[in-house]
């Protein structure tokens, strides 16, 4: 599919849905704020990955070349605090949870990014950016830290709508700040924390600086689309815009933000104790069913989790799967065809997935009628269109990845029951300070090809070189 009819996307900065026109014809550059790898992923984290994976797949289906960058924040206050509380090196804590996020994305067949830069790998670029800001009069040093001077950038607040007098960065009071509305670009060295040398002394980067530097490194001073969760609009994305444009970069031309997964009307978060971890969810539903559910709402809408909604999504997915299996059994091989015009119109209208799904189920109903009437050609046309459309949404039931994973998921579920029993025995041994027995259980599991990692969320197991549970 190469017809590039008008694609319209909601730009947070403009506050409206507007025509998407890339910087370079035929090419799209996208930066997605990825995970801060402080803990295990839950379905709220992964929804963002699914939402913008659909955007990427749709652009690819329309014939664009897509450069898709998703970063990893592997140095940040919460990572340091949680690693210290667990008595583990910060870098090991970050790497462990980065692997868990990668496994979660892979489980839902989120396409790998074109590049996945880590913040710690781009310290040089961050220092260079600070130097440009200081030279331009937009940043200053104070108390070992470096701050961005918010009042030096008159356009501050254009993305979020915040008025300058109402700005609160949430960083607390700092002696080196000239104005409490300013935000930190570089944090001076503290005992026990990692640090890097700079012209202003040793220290580590501020969160906002990291993304600006990495986006520029991979996509250049100006690129097409910046994505992320709606909770990042302020202060994170507002500060990214300010520092990047103050440094002379055009930065992102479109800003897309996805809604949260909520429970009881509250954003899913560990602090509220209402999270549903990816390993737990994948014990209850198949990966393709979970992906279907997370992608089923409009990306800008809140997705209120409930068991009823989850089961409705499973039922809808199984209905499509059953239809495709019936056609394959009675008619023959089903190859992906082309999406219908109504499906394309829906996705061209700011990725209106609910309307696109309604079209898919309409085509399924037509296909079932054709199959029941003995119209094999009509049934095959419907099935081919459904495969194409579900493929763009990332959950084509006949894709070999999903069919093989169904068998793998069932096997992992059976193994998990056995491993969890062993882990419970190990936890009891540790509570009784029977370290020899605890080590024996861990060694027994390792000899069976199962690695155990102790985290703040409890012990997690993974197949050596494979899936995490």
From Swiss-Prot:
Its cofactor is Zn(2+). Its EC number is 6.1.1.16. It is an enzyme of class 6 (ligase). One of its GO terms (molecular function) is cysteine-tRNA ligase activity. Binds 1 zinc ion per subunit. CDD domains: CysRS_core. It comes from the Bacteria. It is found in: Cytoplasm. Keywords: Aminoacyl-tRNA synthetase, ATP-binding, Cytoplasm, Ligase, Metal-binding, Nucleotide-binding, Protein biosynthesis, Zinc. Zn(2+) binds at residues 33, 211, 236, 240. InterPro entries: Cys-tRNA-ligase, Cys-tRNA-synt_Ia_DALR, Cys-tRNA/MSH_ligase, Rossmann-like_a/b/a_fold, tRNA-synt_1_cat_dom, tRNAsynth_Ia_anticodon-bd. HAMAP family: Cys_tRNA_synth. Belongs to the class-I aminoacyl-tRNA synthetase family. Monomer. This is Cysteine--tRNA ligase. The gene is cysS.
